[in-house]
Amino acid sequence: MFSIYFVFSQQRLSQWPLRKQIIIMKFYNREKEVAELKRVQELAFTQNSRMIVVTGRRRIGKTSLIKEALKGTPTVYLFIGRKAESILVTDFVKIARETLSIFVPEGIPTFTNLMQYLFEVGKTRAFNIVIDEFQEFYNIRPDVFSDMQNLWDEYKQETKINLVISGSVYSLMQKIFTDHNEPLFGRADNILCLRAFKIGVLKQIMEDLASGYSNDDLLLYTR
């Protein structure tokens, strides 16, 4: 399985004698996570909607992992940047149109309204929705979490949507999905937490990509 996952700076790469000028990036030691994402997707597409959460610090490979697991299936990918909600929704409407080849009307005012529209589509077709950096709604509009709970409870049993939610702020993602007082508590079918690679795996990666690495170079990716 190949994907852009382990990222080096161009400056540091130039210090190492690479085996090839074109670097092929691959997954290391993530087979179980890919298998679980595929398993949940299969249940969503054949039975009813499922929600899976993927957490882990930034640059640990959440997005690459998700894209690898879902490749070849229709996926509406929504990245929650710290922008005004109206700007995000305008961008997301275009993404939904292009990905699913469906009509999505102009002027949808909120993320909640867009999600409801997509859930209605999910009554007649199966597809993935990936919401990346979901915790950013704390800074944009925290009511989204309650809205998502209501939509999920209303539509889960009658739709075939594989909802993948990821976030890089572990403490906030834990709060959103595991705190008894939060509206989305108990809604996720599974929560995957990506950890940093063990030293043995890191050594394999460095040997594959830059065999002349030093112990100091290795330490850069164990912090």
Task: Locate the predicted segments by residue.
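Phosphate-binding site recognition
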Residues: 1-223
